[in-house]
């Protein structure tokens, strides 16, 4: 009986694991490099790991023809393998004619996305590759909520959209990971080539190279469920007894928005209720997304338009006395707004409109402090927005207005449009003007404010008419290879649009538009274009390195902190808001009144513990010289959360006209590469182990003490005699 017990214990203790558990390479995957769960009010989207999609044999899809192997589950190449696959796939093969195969495949665990290295130029029309919908932000469209249109009536992105609702609104059954590290990609490719690549006759055999990856989301369902779980009374039941903390399962998408006031109006107890002014808001969105949200540079979707606005702001900042004098006389002002989250149902502008309605924009007001005077929706005359600059077909631009509101204030609006046209024509660009009362505004920040006020007018300047010309709006592939001619034309467009912004703004506030006021700095435009667009990272150029001055630190192992990304995210782990904030301070900040301030500590004290809180003081270097100075500016950087999903919003003020996008908190693991052996190999190893154990027991059982060599002195020592 004892012998059989020994046998059982020995066999149970033997590790009979095959090669499938022998990981030979681990690749670190940072936050933002993989697909995860996102939510709106009614649905969940994105990816979730489960037992069916974690492991798989690595295969390649290098060209269109390779998708036929996906349809057959690669049976002709791996006839003895019955598991699932991880497919290496270049991003440019995500197309209209391939997306359905990826969605419906039953043999994929996931896809490993990477940039193919093929050059894509801004005017390339060969591939529809927008990851956004045919009707971007259709659910938040002013005309839909005003019951003037049906859902997605104007398919403005029909040329570029891969799917009707966009790739971010797909609930995938597979996982996705994006590999941007060339060394990691080479390791995966080498593993495939050594073990999985079929021979010339098409055959292959064990062992194979396998891959495992897991991203586990903490939340599921929709944003309504997520919102309820985020409330304090719900967190009480989730609290960790040891730490006292309630785990966050999901949260609203939010990040910094930037508002700059060249000529701010102060508040005070005596004038807070009587001052009224009119405003032109000049705006550009600062966010984009891809099918893996963070992988989104947004060159044309975001960056070129922002450069146009920054150049106009810089020109205004160098002549600020003239603008201040004109604003004081006309009681009209211009301010700049960079909204974040606009590609996801207008998160930033929706929150700003809500705050305006409640008297909290741009700052919370305290009676014992002087702030920038609150702006109300009815004080906005115009929202001048620019989009998709740098990719015009020929030299033609379009201005988009709301037809009904245009007819109500045609004379003044025509004057603004006329100044825009003059600015464009000074650089040999043409402008197509509004056609009539039936005009509708394309997706733009104006939609948020149109719901809050019946008179605010859109003046949207863009290089498209009824449909987007650029076919990669909000896409991983919104990253171009610019030839010298394409780069020069884009810079010319940015210069022309920036001049048009200045011309319209100057006429609105009553500034005499002489050559000095209307001139923009083309050299600065060229420099920022090369830094933000052609450089690999925001701080790779000399201009941005000097502007940084050692202030930027990569605090997180996230894609947005280590690569160029314009996605809004939930935790603000992206560098771009910081980059844009510093550039805006450079454009509008001044050290004329702070020349005697010689340290960062002294500079920061200027804005602290004072009753006058209208200005901020920033210790920042000059991007041309690298020398630090204390810059005074009326620039507000604030995190904006959609009122519909903000846990701080009172229940009675909740309004579903705002964005409901949220994200799940997730746990991301590394990619593991391992060797896969045939199941028969596993059984063979178990059999060998069992036989070895039995032979060992049989051999040991036949032994006695005389079988072993014993030191003759041991018995004497046991008897107490010395050795």
Swiss-Prot record:
Q: Name one GO cellular component term.
A: gamma-secretase complex
Please give the start and end residues of each transmembrane region.
679-699
* Keyword set, alphabetical order: Glycoprotein, Membrane, Notch signaling pathway, Signal, Transmembrane, Transmembrane helix
Kindly report the protein's main subcellular placement as a broad class: membrane
Instruction: Output the SUPFAM superfamilies linked to this UniProt entry.
Output: Zn-dependent exopeptidases
Q: Where in the cell is it found?
A: Membrane
- Glycosylated residues? 40, 181, 271, 328, 409, 627
Q: What are the boundaries of the signal sequence?
A: 1-16
Those parts of the protein on the Cytoplasmic side are: 700-723
Q: Which residues lie on this side of the membrane: Extracellular?
A: 17-678
Function, as annotated: Essential subunit of the gamma-secretase complex, an endoprotease complex that catalyzes the intramembrane cleavage of integral membrane proteins such as Notch (glp-1 or lin-12). It may represents a stabilizing cofactor required for the assembly of the gamma-secretase complex.
To which protein family does this belong?
Answer: Belongs to the nicastrin family.
Q: PANTHER family under this entry? A: NICASTRIN (PTHR21092:SF0)
Q: What is this protein called?
A: Nicastrin
| Source organism (scientific name) | Caenorhabditis elegans
Give the lineage.
Eukaryota, Metazoa, Ecdysozoa, Nematoda, Chromadorea
Gene coding for it: aph-2
